[in-house]
Amino acid sequence: EQRHVLRDEIFPLNVAYNVYLSASEFRKAYNFEKTSADFTYEASREAEAPGREIYVYIIGEASRAMSWELYGYERETNPRLSQVDDLVIFRDVLTQSNTTHKSVPLILSSVSTEEHDQLYRRKGLPALFNEAGFETWFISNQSPQGAMIDKLARDADHLIYIRSPRHDMQLLDEMRRIVETAPAQKMLFILHCYGSHFSYHQRYPREFARFKPDDDVAISREHAHTLRNAYDNSICYTDHF
């Protein structure tokens, strides 16, 4: 316990430790192709569907349950989802991390936080579906960073980064184009959204400015109401998406 306190809480020891930790994680991510090369899920299909199969896996970003109407929020931020019959809502779910670069790789893999080191030895969701005979697409509205998200995404048959990322509806436009033109019968699409990341005002078109004022303002207490409006508008846009 004393070693933990020295390492994590006392300056400058914590700086040196975090530099070491970052370098170690970078090295593991850099070597991912080698350390996961022999991994297999041994996945296969036991039965064939009669028609075309299209599965869509959507990864949202920076979206809080407390700002969703479906979870009891007082504002109507989920007008479309609220009208869906037989919608399955998970109410007892926690993210394994509150940062994108830590949580999304876990979402894309079979690894949990308790076995985080296995992340660098196992392939992710695209590889699993590839083994089962699917053609896979990873379409992202975020720029590549060379981190574990991109490493896992490269296992997809097709990796597409939207140029000049703006609004997430571009992901659906790209997916529709592929569905209409690709001959594949078994398809998996993983769509990585920009979601509700700051600056909130830029995350949705003007016609989705349901709550106003929603000006593009700096983060400060005096702008809290405006920022909340813009954030809630971004949730509404995700609902439309």
PLM regions: where:
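Active-site-proximal alpha/beta segments of enzymes that process anionic O-linked groups
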Residues: 2-57, 62-218
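Metal-dependent active-site segment of extracytoplasmic phospho-/sulfohydrolases and closely related
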Residues: 56-57, 234-241
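Short glycine/proline-rich turn/loop motifs
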Residues: 106, 218-229
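Surface-exposed cleft-lining segments at the edges of enzyme active sites
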Residues: 113, 160-164, 225-235
